[in-house]
């Protein structure tokens, strides 16, 4: 008998930084459902190693964002995840990439490290909703889409363009929306916040990481890829512009 079933989830081709997320998520969903229907439904899944393993540029960052969103969607059956490799010396074989690169005196982060640190800083344990893909924007999405969602027919559906998840803290004081835009064009995320505990007044802070998909940090420029903080007015219905090739964390804190 065993308690945890460990997996390795690597994407080996850098240009599959977004399609690899979907492939791995579909596999993990099937594995989770198989375990739940088995004679041992209490077995937990763990991702012992994962990464976009052949590059540490910003594609690895977007892949990390999509992967972490997928892992949150899997729910309590996923016990833990661990990216790999953690650290490499800059003189090592570059074939296998890492989260952190160093020489004998300094270091710089790979694209995945920057995203995982941001997501960890704004983690919220209760999952509310998630979405994937985009479609042609409506003139009034809150009326035409959200208010009539059961009858809505998305036009020009494009899967694999955006992944997003909304979570909240156990005390109900924070709502966190995390999203990744895999495309080289702007996309829009529309949100409606509702429920008995939704604050009437709140602050909204946005943390955005944006770069060309092939950009990467270095010993000379360790802060080449980093979050930029901004804010926006709080509304229960919000349209959020996702910059090209970007990862965004939006945090709402009730007053």
Residue ranges of model-derived segments:
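Secondary-structure transition/capping motifs at alpha-helix termini
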Residues: 1, 33-43, 70-79, 125, ...
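Active-site proximal loops enriched in glycine and acidic residues that flank catalytic Cys/His/Asp
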Residues: 9, 49, 82-85, 104, ...
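Long hydrophobic segments that form regular secondary structure
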Residues: 18-41, 56-62, 146-186
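Beta-sheet entry/capping signal
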Residues: 3-4, 42-46, 77-82, 99, ...
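Aromatic- and acid-rich polysaccharide-binding/catalytic face
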Residues: 1-24, 48, 52, 78-79, ...
């Amino acid at each position: 008998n065993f308690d945890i079933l460990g997996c390795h989830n690597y994407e080996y081709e850098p240009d599959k930084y977004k399609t690899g997320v979907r492939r791995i998520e579909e596999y993990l969903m099937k594995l989770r459902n198989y375990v739940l229907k088995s004679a041992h439904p209490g077995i937990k899944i763990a991702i012992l190693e994962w990464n976009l393993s052949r590059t540490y540029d910003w594609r690895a960052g977007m892949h990390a964002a999509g992967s972490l969103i997928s892992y949150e969607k899997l729910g309590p059956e996923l016990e833990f995840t661990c990216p790999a490799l953690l650290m490499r010396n800059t003189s090592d074989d570059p074939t296998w990439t890492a989260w952190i690169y160093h020489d004998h005196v300094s270091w710089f982060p790979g694209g995945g490290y920057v995203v995982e640190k941001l997501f960890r800083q704004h983690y919220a344990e209760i999952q509310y909703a998630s979405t994937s893909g985009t479609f042609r924007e409506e003139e009034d999405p809150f009326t035409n889409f959200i208010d009539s969602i059961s009858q809505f027919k998305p036009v020009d559906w494009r899967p694999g363009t955006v992944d997003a998840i909304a979570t909240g803290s156990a005390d109900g004081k924070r709502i966190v929306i995390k999203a990744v835009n895999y495309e080289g064009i702007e996309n829009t995320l529309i949100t409606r916040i509702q429920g008995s505990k939704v604050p009437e007044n709140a602050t909204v802070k946005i943390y955005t990481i944006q770069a060309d998909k092939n950009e990467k940090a270095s010993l000379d420029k360790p802060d080449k890829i980093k979050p930029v903080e901004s804010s926006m007015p709080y509304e229960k219905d919000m349209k959020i512009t996702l910059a090209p090739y970007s990862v965004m964390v939006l945090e709402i804190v009730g007053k």
